[in-house]
Amino acid sequence: MEIRRRPPNPTVRVENLEYAVPHREAKAKNILEEIVWYKDTEIKNFKKIVSLEDLIKKLDKLSPPKDFFQSILHSKIKPGVIAEIKKASPSKGVIREDFKPKEIASCYEKSGASCISVLTDKRFFQGSYEILQDVRTATNLPLLCKDFIISAYQIYKARVSGADAILLIAAILSDDDLFYLKKIADNLKMSVLVEVHDGQELERILSLKSFNLIGINNRNLKTFKTDLKTSIRIMSKYSDIFSKHNIVPISESGINNSDDLKTLNSIGIKGVLIGERFMRESDIENSFKKLFNSI
């Protein structure tokens, strides 16, 4: 999947006239591209409020990050659970009206989740870094900042807001970007979950030899449709490679019942990221128990 960055000049001036016309490449081709293009604007706005230098100054006051990777690896529940806090999505709109992030985080911890993922994108998912900060005060579990990260600034902001891990999406980042952003996270002692959707993206990640936590996204980020067969296809071809190189595979999205979990367990998946399935339930703890007690 090729995701373009926004053209530097989104309009073209018409000769001898007092107006400009849109550049032919100035319109996003899909939802993911639209999200990524908006991130440039969002980051500029963040920097107007808090500079990168000021963010970095706040790092010394923080406690060391919790070990997200080890929490999944040594989870009592198999596969380990990254339980997600998400109010809305571009494809489904508002998922949870009664949205109380701190209460949700407490429910996840009581239920046995290994880690918690927090959506911080505001425009498309109605998340925020303030929500991440609130969740940090409500749980001792490692936290993943779930955003569309394209800049070092976002990593520092995530860390200052309480994140222990970040998500990097292969589809929106070049190899150089992936390597650079991973290095920053490593320097901050944060875990990195790198996300792929197909074999081509996975081959890129494996060639970098830098990632030990790989998320297989069952959701096509161009269409936002989910298909659990994505994980099955990738694991059928790469499970031996994952084992050989001590890579922990995570299956993300589209996991709806205990049969799905049994299938993923049987093919070597070590962790699952589940959000919408829990967000639609009035009783999250009971839903969690029903889902995992039968596997």
Curated annotation (Swiss-Prot):
A single BP term in Gene Ontology: L-tryptophan biosynthetic process
Alphabetical list of InterPro entries matching this protein: Aldolase_TIM (IPR013785), Indole-3-glycerol_P_synth (IPR045186), Indole-3-glycerol_P_synth_dom (IPR013798), Indole-3-GlycerolPSynthase_CS (IPR001468), RibuloseP-bd_barrel (IPR011060)
Entry's EC annotation: 4.1.1.48
Keywords attached to this entry: Amino-acid biosynthesis, Aromatic amino acid biosynthesis, Decarboxylase, Lyase, Tryptophan biosynthesis
Signal sequence annotation: none
Catalytic activity line of the entry: 1-(2-carboxyphenylamino)-1-deoxy-D-ribulose 5-phosphate + H(+) = (1S,2R)-1-C-(indol-3-yl)glycerol 3-phosphate + CO2 + H2O
Annotated source species: Prochlorococcus marinus subsp. pastoris (strain CCMP1986 / NIES-2087 / MED4)
Stored Gene3D superfamilies: Aldolase class I (3.20.20.70)
Protein name, per record: Indole-3-glycerol phosphate synthase
HAMAP family found in the cross-reference section: IGPS_B
Family recorded in the similarity comment: Belongs to the TrpC family.
One Pfam family, short name: IGPS
SUPFAM superfamilies in the record: Ribulose-phoshate binding barrel
Gene Ontology molecular function: indole-3-glycerol-phosphate synthase activity; phosphoribosylanthranilate isomerase activity
CDD domains, A to Z: IGPS
Pathway terms, separated by semicolons: Amino-acid biosynthesis; L-tryptophan biosynthesis; L-tryptophan from chorismate: step 4/5
Superkingdom, natural source: Bacteria
